[in-house]
A protein has these predicted regions:
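Glycine-rich phosphate/pyrophosphate-handling loop used in enzymes and phosphotransfer proteins
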Residues: 1-145
Length: 145
């Protein structure tokens, strides 16, 4: 991979960081090796409403308020730590990497769908005052791009 002088200087001054933990990574890597090995991808024949395996789904017995959902990973390991740091430790930069993975999952699972809008889960006033930001709004803004 040939790198221009400008790219080299840019990387030296502003190194790329792991989308999940913030460690410095190679310019072409979205996550570090440690986080990559810890990712548990969502896969299989899953219900688009509840995310359970279809054989265990009971959505036909319940009223749904949305058509479908998707997620790139299970809430565990590096992803869980990254979300926790975003929500409770002020690591708002984690929203960039998480949103990138989430947007890719939407593209793969809803190709051709024209969305009217992207929304976020409202945060209580007390939580907003404590954190100073709404983590789901940060994610929604990035995904909408």
């Amino acid at each position: 991979m040939k790198v221009s002088v400008l790219e080299y200087i840019s990387y030296a001054l502003f190194p790329r960081r792991c989308a999940l933990c913030g460690k410095v990574v190679a310019p072409d890597m979205p996550v570090c090796g440690s986080c990559e090995s810890d990712l548990e991808y969502v896969k299989g024949d899953l219900c688009p409403h509840c995310g359970r395996e279809k054989k265990y789904c009971s959505c036909s017995f319940h009223r749904r308020f949305f058509e479908a959902q998707t997620a790139p990973f299970y809430y565990s390991g590096a992803v869980k730590r990254s979300i926790h740091a975003l929500k409770f430790n002020g690591r708002t930069q984690n929203a960039d990497g998480l949103a990138r993975f989430m947007a890719q999952s939407v593209k793969e699972n809803f190709a051709g769908v024209k969305f009217d809008f992207v929304c976020c889960v409202p945060l209580s006033e007390a939580s907003y005052k404590k954190r100073g930001y709404n983590q789901s709004a940060l994610l929604a803004k990035r995904i909408a791009k």
